């Protein structure tokens, strides 16, 4: 197949490559997972037609990511992207608010838009378009005993270890914070509208409704809210 024909007919070739910022090459690894995923109709997947140069085996996957269009073994190298796509859909569905200082760095490269979040006065915030990133939630277990006593008198979010099917994130030991993916989204959005600063809120469990959305069960001073 000639490249012009491949370019016109291939979903994988026609995907625009993300323009990585030259001054910060690792920004995608630290802020948001980036992966190009393609899909195909069921009848095309049954034929192994994913719009690549070569046909692929019959797969149960609905999304894949092409790593190499051709190898020395005359094969098309690919990996499954189902977990990645489901994770991003869950994050977008929960509409995670974005810390303003993080958003300034990554905002030019975001595709889907949501409201930003900042604890500062709204009048002092710079005007920026909305975006989406990880939430920063302090972990109670990461503090010392004296800090735990001090924090017990103020409002904080304690995330319990619950089974989450799709979670991205990594620890930041220097700041005693954890950058959450889906779990951070759930904790952040579930406390929307709660303004009291005298209570402690704890995520006890997770439920899933008929549409597949995750609903956290939050308690306030041992009383369900």
From Swiss-Prot:
Q: Which InterPro entries match?
A: Rbsml_bS1m-like
Once renumbered to this chain, the transit peptide range reads 1-84
Q: Print the keywords alphabetically.
A: Meiosis, Mitochondrion, Ribonucleoprotein, Ribosomal protein, Transit peptide
Report the subcellular localization: Mitochondrion
User: Which GO BP terms sit in this record?
Assistant: meiotic cell cycle; mitochondrial translational initiation
Q: Source organism's superkingdom?
A: Eukaryota
Q: Which GO terms describe its cellular component?
A: mitochondrial small ribosomal subunit
Q: Which Pfam families match?
A: Mit_ribos_Mrp51 (PF11709)
Gene Ontology molecular functions = structural constituent of ribosome
Q: What happens when the gene is disrupted?
A: Severely decreases cytochrome c oxidase activity. Increases degradation of cytochrome b cob1 protein, and decreases synthesis of cytochrome c oxidase subunit cox3. Cytochromes b and c1 appear absent from cell. Abolishes growth on the non-fermentable carbon source galactose.
Q: According to its UniProt record, which protein family does this protein belong to?
A: Belongs to the bacterial ribosomal protein bS1 family.
Q: What function is annotated for this protein?
A: Component of the mitochondrial ribosome (mitoribosome), a dedicated translation machinery responsible for the synthesis of mitochondrial genome-encoded proteins, including at least some of the essential transmembrane subunits of the mitochondrial respiratory chain. The mitoribosomes are attached to the mitochondrial inner membrane and translation products are cotranslationally integrated into the membrane. Functionally interacts with the 5'-UTR of mitochondrial mRNAs. Specifically plays a role in the translation of cob1/cytochrome b and cox3. Has a role in meiosis.
Q: What is the protein's quaternary organization?
A: Component of the mitochondrial small ribosomal subunit (mt-SSU). Mature yeast 74S mitochondrial ribosomes consist of a small (37S) and a large (54S) subunit. The 37S small subunit contains a 15S ribosomal RNA (15S mt-rRNA) and at least 32 different proteins. The 54S large subunit contains a 21S rRNA (21S mt-rRNA) and at least 45 different proteins. This subunit is mutually exclusive with mrp51/small ribosomal subunit protein bS1m.
For this entry, the protein name equals Small ribosomal subunit protein L51-b
Organism of provenance: Schizosaccharomyces pombe (strain 972 / ATCC 24843)
Encoding gene (name): mug178
